[in-house]
C-alpha cells in the first residue's frame, strides 16, 4: 500500500545468501544465524575477515552469499557445502563466500538499536565489505538494472527513518517476475578471462505471430564450466 511506502529511502542490492548477525569483542567472534544458532565454526574465512577490521567491538547484521571464482554471485544452493561439510576448511574450498554488511547494532560499545537507520549509517559506513547501496530515489531503476546485470536477485528498499527491528517486515523487495518462457538461442559470444575459450553469453528470442523472432536479451549466468564447454 502507498501509505506504507517509506518517504526516506535507502536502496540496496538483494543478495541471494543467508543472513547472519556477527558479534566481535577483540579477538572473540561469534556468528549467529537468523534462528539464533551459533554457526561460527562454518565460517573461518568470515571470522578472519572481520577480525582484520580496525573496529574491535561491534555487532553487525550481514548477508553471506556464495560467489564464483570471478567474484560474481553464485547459486544459493552452493551454500549447502558450508551447512553440511564436516570439515570447515573443506566447506571454504567448496563454497567461497562474500560478505555484505547492511546494518550495525553496536559500534565500539555504543548501542544503536533505538537509532534510526539514517543515523546508523554513519557507523555502517565505517566498515569495509558494505552492501552496495544508493540513497537517491531517482537512481532506483538504474540501480535495479545494475543489480540484475551483475547477477544479484534484485533490490531492497528500506526506510531511513526506521529503528532497528530484528525481524523486519517493513523492507520492500523488488525482483524480476518469475515466468516460464519458451525461447530460442539466436546468437552466442565468447566470454572473457577464464571463459575466453567458451561461448559464455547467449542471445535469447521468442517467436512472434508472423513466424519471426523478437530479441529479449542475453543470458550468461547459471551455467557450470562443464555446461559452457558442452554448449560450445
Model-derived features with residue positions:
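Covalent nucleotidyltransferase
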Residues: 10-19, 23-127, 182, 198
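Nucleic-acid 5′ end/cap handling module spanning
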Residues: 1-35, 89-96, 120, 125, ...
Amino acid at each position: 500500500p502507498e501509505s506504507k511506502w517509506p518517504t526516506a529511502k535507502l536502496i540496496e542490492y538483494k543478495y541471494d545468501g543467508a543472513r547472519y548477525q556477527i558479534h566481535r569483542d577483540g579477538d572473540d567472534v561469534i556468528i549467529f544465524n537468523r534462528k539464533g544458532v551459533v554457526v561460527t565454526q562454518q565460517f573461518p574465512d568470515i571470522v578472519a575477515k572481520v577480525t582484520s577490521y580496525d573496529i574491535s567491538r561491534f555487532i553487525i547484521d550481514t548477508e553471506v552469499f556464495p560467489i564464483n571464482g570471478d567474484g560474481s554471485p553464485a547459486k544459493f544452493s552452493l551454500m549447502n557445502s558450508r551447512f553440511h561439510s564436516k570439515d570447515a576448511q573443506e566447506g571454504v574450498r567448496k563454497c567461497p563466500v562474500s560478505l555484505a554488511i547492511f546494518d550495525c547494532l553496536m559500534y565500539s560499545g555504543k548501542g544503536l538499536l533505538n537509532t534510526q537507520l539514517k543515523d546508523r549509517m554513519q557507523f555502517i559506513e565505517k566498515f569495509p565489505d558494505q552492501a552496495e547501496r544508493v540513497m537517491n530515489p531517482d537512481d532506483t531503476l538504474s540501480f535495479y538494472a545494475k543489480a540484475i546485470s551483475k547477477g544479484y536477485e534484485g533490490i531492497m528498499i528500506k526506510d531511513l527513518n526506521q529503528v532497528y527491528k530484528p525481524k523486519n517486515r517493513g523492507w520492500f523487495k523488488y525482483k524480476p517476475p518469475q515466468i516460464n518462457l519458451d525461447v530460442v538461442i539466436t546468437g552466442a559470444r565468447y566470454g572473457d578471462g577464464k571463459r575466453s575459450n567458451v561461448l559464455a553469453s547467449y542471445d535469447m528470442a521468442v517467436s512472434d505471430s508472423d513466424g519471426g523472432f523478437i530479441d529479449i536479451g542475453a543470458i550468461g549466468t547459471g551455467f557450470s564450466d562443464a555446461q559452457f564447454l558442452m554448449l560450445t
